[in-house]
From Swiss-Prot:
InterPro entries: 4Fe4S_Fe-S-bd, 4Fe4S_Fe_S_CS, Co_F420_Hydgase/DH_bsu_N, FRHB/FDHB/HCAR-like, FrhB_FdhB_C, Helical_ferredxn. Its EC number is 1.17.98.3. [4Fe-4S] cluster 1 binds at residues 286, 289, 292, 345. It comes from Methanococcus maripaludis (strain DSM 14266 / JCM 13030 / NBRC 101832 / S2 / LL). This is F420-dependent formate dehydrogenase 1 subunit beta. Residues 366-387 are annotated as: Disordered. The genome of M.maripaludis harbors two sets of genes encoding the F420-dependent formate dehydrogenase (Fdh), fdhA1-fdhB1 (Fdh1 isozyme) and fdhA2-fdhB2 (Fdh2 isozyme). The Fdh1 isozyme is the primary Fdh and the Fdh2 isozyme may not play a major role. Belongs to the FrhB family.
Amino acid sequence: MSNEMYYVQASDPAILEKGECGGAVTALFKYLLDKGIVDGVLALKKGVDVYDAIPTFVTSSEDLLSTAGSLHCAPTMWGGIIKEYLQDAKIAVPVKPCDMRAIVELAKRAQINLDNVYMIGLNCGGTVPPKTAMEMIKLFYEVDPKDVVKEEIDKGKFIIVMKDGSHKEVKMHDLEDNGYGRRVNCQRCDEKIPRKADIAAGNWGVIGEDAGKYTFMEVCTEKGKQLLKDAEKDGYVKTKAPNPKGLEIRAKVESSMLKMGEDYKNKWLEEKYPTIEEWNRQWNKCIKCYGCRDVCPVCFCRECALTADYVDTGSIPPDPIMFQGVRMSHMAFSCVNCGQCEDVCPMEIPVARIFHKIQEKTRKELGYRPGVDDEAPPALGGSCPTQ
């Protein structure tokens, strides 16, 4: 289908006030819950502060407002949660591009039924680890991180809002040049608008007097088209045609961010890519905690070949080449560059970098993009296993 584009705004005053950019995403979730189309909405709600996000399954539209708004300092991955706990439920979920790609890859493996999932994609410029965010706010913004009540990434800047309503901002380039800013995998991301979702939403392209009051929505599937049509018909949202200039600006923003991602990809996967000797030093730090395996959203085997000991009893440390080699042979074709494996590694091994590097080589050789292409990964021989 040819994707249709709209400016969309929530009709509910409470959602308008609390929601991001007109609250359209929250309004669509409310429609799905109120009409009984889904059993619940899987989303994040703020915990004690902006660095603390709590995954929550909302089953009543009255509780949706607690999930409204963005949390860039709390990276979370939905694919594994849906696969493990919500396989049989009908759900709606807001997805970053890497979330979307993981869900699509799991669907190819018969681990998620896409007929049961409404994906509302969120345009994404990247996320920041909570610890990094607190450190950089203290260092670069010279304020107490606990006094920050809101943050956002806009026009190449990381912006914070304080308790007193004041704003402070620093260019993302300046932060990242000093080892802070977005997660490294986000820096080299090559998917900014999640068009495999049913609807892709964001603020890019909303300009003039509409800025901040409407959400830009690109309808990507027939399911998404019907959802928006029905939600408007029943008075949950209002839509209007986007400003033509806004369409141009949105395309330029996406193009600019993709170019930036390619530059960072060259930096981290080529110029600063570890040598074999450096990798050997990194792998020798591995303690076989299984964190990288357990957090990977695309890993799904019920009986894992890595669970059994892969060294003789009493041998320490374990052979990291065997452990990571098996993982790479299983997953590198389908790495969605979510960075979760690197986030959880207690030894701070840059695991995601080698997986992304191998996936890039696969893509160049075979043309396969995990979570974007419709066919099964080449490693699966064109067929998807059921377990």
